[in-house]
Curated annotation (Swiss-Prot):
The keyword DNA-binding applies. Pfam families: Mob_Pre (PF01076). It comes from Bacillus thuringiensis. InterPro entries: Mob_Pre (IPR001668). Signal peptide: none annotated. GO terms for biological process: DNA recombination. The keyword RNA-binding does not apply. DNA binds at residues 45, 113. GO terms for molecular function: DNA binding. Keywords: DNA-binding, Plasmid. This is Plasmid recombination enzyme. Belongs to the plasmid mobilization pre family.
Length: 445
């Protein structure tokens, strides 16, 4: 189990103070720090303040009362120390021992940088590893606001050496963190890289979701298109039936018109040649027989009159039969029903076409969003590559400047990156250089 005492410091300007207060006092929920368990935030406590203080107004008041000269707008007004230990060791301590660890750390800071300069000592119990934020104003003994003079490079190196020794004297079994292979929380460049990697992952998830959505929308479009095609086929069949029936109706109208022309509009008397008579001869006893003409009730017609009469009767018979058939099959009603079906299908297809048009528009919009996300992901990846290159350059330049002190400086960087898991790119550059040097050496051999 690692047992490293961890302390690192970061400087802030007045414009940063409000954000520091919000984080320390859990004012609102952080979207970037996923390690915070807000159900445990009630367990957090401040060793110096019973009530929450306002960082900015407190700092301004201290500067007004204690600092001789008015500071510049970009002056460092707050130096915040983060104090903890290796996660395994920290969790092995009881709550009482954890509190004593933080109280001892606070006592160490106050003795070193002044009790009057110490504004807060906020202990966070709601993250992965318990730790404490100690806010110190960099006011010197001669009442100057100068983080540069108070926290020199020599002082920071000494701090990393003295803090573990102090904690051991207080009864804690801890060592200096130099040489640790742990992965740590980065300062500004590393934190930005971590945030960008998280954002890239989130955008990749969104991109995957949008791809799925595009496929689903495409399938819906295909189904809608197939449905509309079937509806169009049905409509065409009904239209053909409608045209066929309309043609039959027109033909029947023509037949009716022909028969109507053959049938008089008004009752007519049939012409005939004469009435048929029968001659009766009555014999008498005396005289001539009596001859009489009696009507039989029949009529005598010519052949032409008979032909005309037959045609009219036949036409009437045909009209009667068609009329009786129409009583059973109402072509008018059938035609009206087909018209209504045709209208309904036309309205349905019109609505489906509108839905299809909307789906095509939605699909194009999703493709545009997907394209934009792809571009943004590429930009973020390029930004990450730039950060990695900057770290590489920083490593090389730092090595040139510090030379003999480089090992101590590298140890300082490691300790300053000791809160949450993130790749230590600075150390990676060192390891890569060692391996490259070893590889060249092996090739020479």
């Amino acid at each position: 189990m690692n047992k490293f005492a961890i302390i690192h410091m970061q400087k802030f300007q007045i414009s940063d103070v409000q954000g520091i207060q919000k984080h320390n006092q859990r004012q609102g929920k952080s979207k970037s720090n996923l390690d915070i368990d807000y159900s445990k935030s009630e367990q957090n406590y401040d060793l110096l303040n019973q009530q929450k203080i306002r960082y900015e107004s407190t700092i301004k008041q201290e500067i007004s009362e204690r600092v001789k000269r008015k500071p510049r707008a970009n002056s460092v007004v707050l130096s915040e120390f983060v104090v903890t230990a290796s996660p395994d060791y920290m969790h092995s301590l009881s709550l009482e021992e954890q509190k004593r660890y933080f109280e001892s750390s606070l006592d160490f800071i106050q003795k070193r940088y002044g009790k009057q300069n110490t504004l807060y000592a906020m202990v966070h119990m709601d993250e992965a590893t318990p730790h404490m934020h100690i806010g110190v104003m960099p006011i010197t003994e001669d009442n100057r606001l100068s983080a540069k003079d108070m926290f020199t490079r020599k002082e920071l190196i000494s701090l990393q050496q003295d803090f573990p020794l102090e904690m051991r004297e207080k009864g804690f079994d801890v060592d200096r963190g130099e040489g640790s292979e742990k992965k740590h929380l980065s300062p500004q460049a590393f934190k930005e890289k971590q945030d960008l990697e998280v954002e890239v992952e989130q955008l990749s998830n969104v991109k995957t979701h949008l791809k799925t959505k595009v496929v689903e929308t495409h399938n819906q479009l295909q189904q809608t298109t197939n449905y509309i095609e079937k509806q169009n086929e049905t409509l065409q069949k009904i239209q053909q039936q409608f045209l066929s029936l309309d043609k039959k109706i027109k033909e029947k109208k023509q037949e009716f018109e022909t028969f109507r022309n053959q049938i008089p509009d008004k009752p007519v008397s049939m012409s005939y040649l004469r009435e048929e008579t029968k001659t009766e001869v009555t014999t008498k006893l005396f005289g001539k027989p009596e001859i009489t003409e009696k009507k039989t009730g029949n009529i005598v017609v010519t052949r032409e009159q008979w032909r005309d009469m037959t045609e009219k009767v036949n036409a009437a018979v045909i009209v009667k039969k068609d009329y009786e058939r129409l009583q059973k099959t109402d072509l008018v009603k059938e035609n009206q029903s087909l018209r209504e079906d045709n209208k309904y299908l036309e309205e349905t297809i019109k609505g489906n076409n509108l839905a299809l048009k909307h789906s095509y528009k939605q699909n194009r919009e999703l493709e545009e969003v997907n394209k934009e996300l792809h571009t943004e992901i590429g930009t973020l990846k390029a930004h990450i590559r730039d950060l990695q290159m900057n770290i590489k350059v920083l490593y090389q330049q730092t090595k040139k400047v510090f030379k003999e002190q480089f090992k101590a400086f590298r140890g300082l960087i490691k300790n300053e990156l000791d809160m949450k898991g993130v790749d230590n790119q600075f150390e990676r550059e060192h390891t890569r250089e060692i391996r490259s040097r070893q590889k060249g050496y092996d090739m020479e051999r």
